[in-house]
A protein has these predicted regions:
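N-terminal small/polar loop signature for handling phosphorylated ligands or for N-terminal nucleophile
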Residues: 53, 58-120, 222-254
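Glycine-rich phosphate/diphosphate-binding loops that line cofactor/substrate pockets in enzymes
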Residues: 37-52, 194-202
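Short glycine-rich or small-residue beta-strand-to-loop segments that form or flank ligand, phosphate
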Residues: 23, 51-57, 127, 206-210
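Gly/Ser/Thr-enriched, mixed-charge loops and adjacent short helices
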Residues: 2-10, 31, 118-254
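Phosphate/oxyanion-binding active-site loops and adjacent basic polyanion-contact surfaces
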Residues: 28-37, 41, 61-62, 90, ...
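Positively charged, low-complexity intrinsically disordered leader regions
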Residues: 1-37
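Short, glycine/acidic-enriched loop or turn micro-motifs at the edges of active sites
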Residues: 21, 60, 213
Length: 254
């Protein structure tokens, strides 16, 4: 059942090229995420029945935001949602999924290298059908809408199971939980000479990849250790954590 929820604008929802970034506690305000997402939908045309991609870097609030956007996509008339397993999709992986499956667009939940956790940062970015960030004309329209929004649409539905690959339905909209890594790994195999790199590892080459408990971990495990034959343990800190293991996930802090 679709609910139309009355709301009032927030004055601070101006997105940049990297989307809307604020502290987690700002996003946790009642209606804050919903207002911004509805403002994005209200600024777009022609998405009825189309496909929307959703995923993020696994930081604190990621899973909750995914569930909200799924229910709002159903209420606003999307025909299908593709969401990464566990709510995980790196920014380039999300871009690839949008392009590969001909999606109308997608939401990427990330604040890049900014710290994660209940007292740290969160972000929402909308990417268009070419996989890239929304252009200024779209972000300006979104900001204008955030200043006048009076209601948003959301279906009353249970949370979907984000951890099991497969399909389900939310208020008549198809939701597919997909392997977060498979399509991106396949793209990398098209772009790079995997047999040559595999031979390099087979010859004794060693490296250590520190994923910093952030989103790259599952991709690094699959590509380096499973597909290229690097020894188990090549990837360290490879499980995404909501607070990135209490570390700042930036390899260039100096």
């Amino acid at each position: 059942m679709t609910q139309i929820v009355k709301t009032t604008p927030f004055p601070d929802q101006k997105p940049g090229t990297s989307g809307l970034r604020k502290k987690v506690k700002v996003f946790q305000q009642p209606h804050y995420i919903e207002n911004f997402v509805q403002s994005v939908f209200d600024s777009l045309e022609g998405y009825a029945g189309k496909t929307l991609v959703i995923g993020g870097d696994g930081r604190f609030l990621n899973r909750e935001a995914v569930q909200v956007i799924v229910r709002m996509a159903a209420a606003n008339g999307f025909g299908r949602v593709l969401v990464g397993r566990g709510g995980i999709l790196s920014t380039p992986a999300a871009s690839n999924v949008i392009r590969k499956y001909g999606a109308f667009g997608g939401f990427v939940l990330s604040a890049s290298h900014n710290p994660g956790g209940p007292d740290e940062d969160f972000g929402i970015k909308y990417n268009i059908g070419n996989g890239g960030p929304a252009p200024e004309g779209v972000t300006d329209a979104v900001f204008a809408r955030t200043k006048e929004i009076a209601e948003y649409r959301i279906v009353d539905a249970s949370d979907i199971d984000l951890d099991s690959i497969g399909g389900t339905s939310v208020a008549g909209m198809t939701v597919e939980v997909i392997d977060s890594v498979a399509d991106y790994a396949a793209l990398m195999e098209e772009l790079f000479d995997f047999p040559a790199i595999r031979a390099l590892f087979a010859g004794g080459f060693a490296l250590s990849f520190d994923a910093m408990s952030a989103v790259t971990g599952p991709y690094a495990h699959r590509i380096f250790e499973e597909l290229l034959g690097a020894p188990a343990g090549t990837v360290v800190n490879g499980t995404p954590l909501p607070d990135f293991g209490h570390h700042h996930p930036d390899p260039n802090l100096v």
